[in-house]
Amino acid sequence: MSDTPHTAIDTVYPGNLFMVVAPSGAGKSTLVNALLAQDAAIRLSISHTTRAPRPGEQDGREYHFCTVDSFRAARDRGEFLEWAEVHGNYYATSRVWIEEQMAQGNDVLLEIDWQGAQQVHQRFSNAVEIFILPPSLTALEDRLKKRGQDEPNVIVRRLLAAGSEMSHASESDYVIINEVFDNALEELRNVVRATRLRFSSQKARHTELFIELGIH
C-alpha cells in the first residue's frame, strides 16, 4: 500500500463511508453482495487497476481498467484515496467518486484490507470500519478448501496471512463473527442502520430541520 500522507477531511457528508475488512475465506464478499441487494442506498466502490481484464470481466463492473500512464496521472493529481502495487499491477480507490457519492447522500462501501483501511481513516476520520471474523480457524480452513480455488500450499499461506490480518480487528469499529450467515447479514445491516442515525449523519442529511429546531 502507498504511504502517501493525506490530510484528514472533517467535512461531514450526507452519505456515510463503510469499510468491510476480513481475511480471505471469512465470507466478506458474500455478505457485502447480500447487503447491496437489500439496500439500494449503498454504492459499492469499484477499484481502478492497470491489470488486463480477465475473461468475463467488464470495465466498470469488476474494475475500472486503465493504462499505467493514466493511473499514474490520476494518482499524481490526488484522485485516489489509497493505492497499491500488487504483482506488478496498480490498484486504487477513487477519492473523487467517493466524495461525489457521499455529497449526494449515498452511502459508500469499500471492500478493503486493514492497511487500506488505515489509509482511508487518515483521510476520512468518520469512516466506519467493520471487521468480519470466522467462527474458528478450523472453519476458515474448511471454507478455503471448499472454495476449490487454491492449491494446498496457497491455503496454508492464506491461513498464515489471516492470523496477521485478524490481529488488526481491534482497530475496527465493529466486529461481526460470520458463523450463521443470516445472523451475520442482519448484524451488518444493523451497523448500517445505527450509523445512519448518528447525530452527525442526521444533521448532515437534515440540515435545514436542525437549523429550524435550533440544534447545533
From Swiss-Prot:
Domain (Guanylate kinase-like): residue spans on this chain: 15-193
Subcellular localization: Cytoplasm
EC number: 2.7.4.8
SMART domains: GuKc
Keyword Protein biosynthesis: no
One Gene Ontology molecular-function label: guanylate kinase activity
Catalytic reaction list: GMP + ATP = GDP + ADP
GO CC annotation terms, alphabetical: cytosol
Regions crossing the membrane: none
Domain of life, source organism: Bacteria
Amino acids binding ATP: A22, P23, S24, G25, A26, G27, K28, S29
Gene3D superfamilies (alphabetical): Guanylate Kinase phosphate binding domain (3.30.63.10), P-loop containing nucleotide triphosphate hydrolases (3.40.50.300)
Family matches, as Pfam families: Guanylate_kin (PF00625)
Keywords noted in UniProt: ATP-binding, Cytoplasm, Kinase, Nucleotide-binding, Transferase
Described function: Essential for recycling GMP and indirectly, cGMP.
Family: Belongs to the guanylate kinase family.
PANTHER family: GUANYLATE KINASE, GUANYLATE KINASE-RELATED
Name of this chain's protein: Guanylate kinase
Originating organism: Cupriavidus pinatubonensis (strain JMP 134 / LMG 1197)
Name of encoding gene: gmk
